[in-house]
């Protein structure tokens, strides 16, 4: 059983809880998720099974889309509704001011991750330190916000969709927006709508999965990687690439870009893995047969 299941994670459980449930249903130990969703959050959580655990990092590279409900006027230590309230303020803002400030975050930004996160610094998870009352300096990380679509502003609440890169913390985004508005803000609700190429419309609820039907909800490994461009190789190259040989044939190299991963097939139908061209030629980067 190898592939990816697009699970609809409910609120109130951890991402690892979902992994544990899938292990029980599938009766297989090799199961992993493709990016943590906080217990407060719900939505798309792709779960990799069997050989598909080898592509966790590649799926995580994809874009994410979230529906965010943010509450202005409140600041907490966790940057969400579940934390200890540190400050509350009256809001004297107009919807236009709020929208203008939020839209400023579209593009490349430097974001400081929250203390209450699974990120490790010097081998320690930040949330373990935070629970001990220890706060340490965190370096800002480059992230990209592709788009923000504001759905409603009913102060103190704002609902918007955000499409973002890997590594984006929505709680930090809310905190930063609140800081810019001088009002404070917390993430009130969060739903992941997409974890490319998976979307919420096709996600399956945990309670609807069982030992009998789980296979029908498994997406094959190559389909889970469809964000990567397809490359078909002639049958004569099969043994070479499977043995790790670098291809220098111009018929292969002239049609592809350098330093870009390709979803690689033999003769259009036999998927073998992800390959890449570098200065020396083309080679399979991750064998997935």
From Swiss-Prot:
Q: Which GO terms describe its molecular function?
A: RNA binding; tRNA pseudouridine(55) synthase activity
Would the keyword tRNA processing turn up in this protein's UniProt record?
yes
Question: What Enzyme Commission number(s) appear in the record?
Answer: 5.4.99.25
Catalytic residues as annotated in Swiss-Prot or TrEMBL:
38 (nucleophile)
Q: What does it catalyze?
A: uridine(55) in tRNA = pseudouridine(55) in tRNA
Q: Which Pfam families match?
A: TruB_C_2, TruB_N
The UniProt record lists the keyword Acyltransferase: no
UniProt record, GO biological process: mRNA pseudouridine synthesis; tRNA pseudouridine synthesis
Instruction: Identify the domain of life.
Output: Bacteria
CDD domains (UniProt xref): PseudoU_synth_EcTruB
Give the UniProt keywords, A-Z.
Isomerase, tRNA processing
Give a short account of what the protein does.
Responsible for synthesis of pseudouridine from uracil-55 in the psi GC loop of transfer RNAs.
User: Of which family is this protein a member?
Assistant: Belongs to the pseudouridine synthase TruB family. Type 1 subfamily.
Its name, as the record gives it, is tRNA pseudouridine synthase B
Taxonomic path: Bacteria, Bacillati, Bacillota, Clostridia, Eubacteriales
State the gene name recorded for this protein.
Answer: truB
